[in-house]
């Protein structure tokens, strides 16, 4: 079972949460505060495939690098996207500086790269810096593709 780590907004501890439980209103293991998925969540190469396959909602996988100015500029836009689509989209981030092999595995050649998955399959992708409007179009086009 693949899990992602959701930080508690109240007590700040990390809560490993199975991807299948994201829609069942998970709660913090310590304080029982509701855990919301309304920000991009950092992930690892070990968790990516399992989460993409088992998540009950579409997954936007964001490849970024700390040294990349376009990645830094995209961060606030991706936060807005995650907040706007909370409960309907899971936004995951993978740091390619710490996980360089994932770029090759997913055919990523520019930062940031966004790949939309639904039902475990890739639907659409964008590479390089893009506006909020272009990211929303990616989500809309990806929702329409079957």
Predicted features by range, described:
Residues 17-26:
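Short linker/helix segments within small regulatory modules
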Residues 15, 35, 75:
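Cys/His-rich microdomains that often coordinate metals
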Residues 8-11, 28-31, 71:
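Short cysteine-rich clusters marking metal-coordination/redox-active sites
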Residues 63-77:
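Conserved redox-active cysteine motifs that mediate thiol-disulfide chemistry
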Residues 55-59, 106-115:
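Structural micro-motif
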Residues 42-43, 63, 78-82, 86-101:
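Thiol-based oxidoreductase modules, predominantly thioredoxin-like and allied folds used
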Residues 14, 40-59:
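A short beta-strand-turn-helix
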Residues 110, 115-146:
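Non-catalytic, surface beta->alpha helical segment in thiol-disulfide oxidoreductase systems
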């Amino acid at each position: 079972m693949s899990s992602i780590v959701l930080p508690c907004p109240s007590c700040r501890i990390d809560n490993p949460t199975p991807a299948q439980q994201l829609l069942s209103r998970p709660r913090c293991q310590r304080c029982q505060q509701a855990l919301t998925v309304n920000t991009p969540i950092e992930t690892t190469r070990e968790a990516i495939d399992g989460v993409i396959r088992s998540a009950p909602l579409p997954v936007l996988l964001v490849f970024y690098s700390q040294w990349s100015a376009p990645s830094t500029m995209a961060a606030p836009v991706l936060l807005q996207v995650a907040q706007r689509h909370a409960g309907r989209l899971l936004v995951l981030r993978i740091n390619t500086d710490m996980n360089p092999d994932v770029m090759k595995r997913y055919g990523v050649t520019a930062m940031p790269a966004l790949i939309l998955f639904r039902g475990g399959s890739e639907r659409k992708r964008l590479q390089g810096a893009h506006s909020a409007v272009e990211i929303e179009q990616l989500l809309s086009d990806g929702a329409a593709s079957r």
